[in-house]
Amino acid sequence: MDWSRLPDIVAVGLLASAFASVAGRNLTRVSSIWLTGWLLIVLHFTALMFFPAPGLWGMLAGLIALASLTWAGSLFMWASVPFRNESSSRWMLWLLLASNTLYICALDVGGPPWLLTCAAILLGTGPLMLTLLTLRRFSHRLRWMTVVLYFSLGIFLLSVQRRAGNGPDLALNGVLFTVYLGCCFHFWYKYRRATTGAFITICGFFAWSCVFLVSPLKEAYFPAIRIESEVWNLPKYVVALGMILLLLEEQIEHNKHLALHDVLTGLPNRRLFQDRLTITLERARRTGTKAALLVLDLDRFKQVNDTLGHHVGDLLLQSVARIFNGRIRRSDTVARTGGDEFSVILEGPTNAAEALHVGRSLQELLKEPMELENRTVKTGASFGVAIFPDDADDLEALCIAADQRMYENKRANQVSDEHYPKTKPPASQSAKPKGGGRFSLHL
């Protein structure tokens, strides 16, 4: 047994434990695939401990060590595929796992030349054939990147595997180089945003792939230079560190999202709404433009909750959120600011007529009956509009103005655009809703 591998087993095992601890209860499919990959790396080092054993056990240990290393890389690559749920993506994973394993086994046990040739052809053309067979149903640039990588690998294997001397070593390093360079490309595609964890992971995978390129070059041209195994294994630890940072970054982003969004509807909550409204008003004040605040309150929502249950009420709120999201511009903001209250910030060049048009459009959409839990639910909405700076010149007064007009709207039974205030009250009254709450709209 090679006891020098024990520190690597302990180190990678501890990293895998730390990874599992960070993932914790929020273990996603991606992080579970990553964890499986790191357990395979632990298996890789464990098998290397038994590799010096003579006979069958040593050969099996070598095969397990190589296969687990390629399986881990294939899983890391697949975890970063944005279309994992696509059936052809799963077929591609199994094809790569099978063809890599077949070639490594044929190479390691010294299989006949025809078997090596067939395995190399399968490894090089298998992804291409699968991509062409599923082209009508699905296509993606990452899929074609994989095709190019493995087609190039197939050509390389056919050219070096029969070379005397270091041919088998070059072929083996070529397979591992392709697997981990594919990880680098896939992670770069998925995590292109400039975060520390993404940068470290991508660089780590690139360095990991370069190990299988530099090692044969060193043996060929600088055989006298000795590099310790810890140096070759360093990229593995860099990737592990990067993945742990990625998990932490994603959890921080998730917590930020939960703090600023409504859990039920996914819309911005009151806190984020007020932040965005503050920014909108500052921008409008700086550019001399107007902004509108639209407040909508659902009609008969309490009746839905009382008669059909809170579950149906929740479904109603989610449906309303989807409707509003589908009709509001990207530059605008729709938020859930109360139990059955929604608020909309209308940015850019806007005026009372445009804001009223948006409010009426949303109002009309809610007139349509909704099918929830095989039940037809009818609701409606009352809304109020306030324009900055015509109705108020600060956030609090603008919200009060819109709220008061919405509540007057609920009490009234008619639409009366004529009552919209035409003049701006004196600045001394800016702490109160401007227009005296005379604007009246109702469903």
Cite the ranges covered by each PLM segment.
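Juxtamembrane segments at transmembrane-helix boundaries
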Residues: 14-31, 47-221, 226, 242, ...
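Hydrophobic transmembrane alpha-helical segments in integral membrane proteins
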Residues: 1-14
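A short pre-motif secondary-structure segment
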Residues: 333-336, 377
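Conserved nucleotide-binding and Mg2+-coordinating catalytic segments in signaling enzymes
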Residues: 256-275, 296-310, 318
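Catalytic-core segments of nucleotide cyclases and related cyclic-nucleotide turnover enzymes
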Residues: 352, 356-363, 367, 371-373, ...
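Short helix/loop segment flanking the catalytic signature motif in cyclic-nucleotide metabolism enzymes
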Residues: 316, 329, 343-364
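Hydrophobic framework residues that shape the active-site pocket
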Residues: 301, 320, 334, 342, ...
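Signal-transducing coiled-coil linker helices
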Residues: 199-201, 207-264, 271-281, 332-333
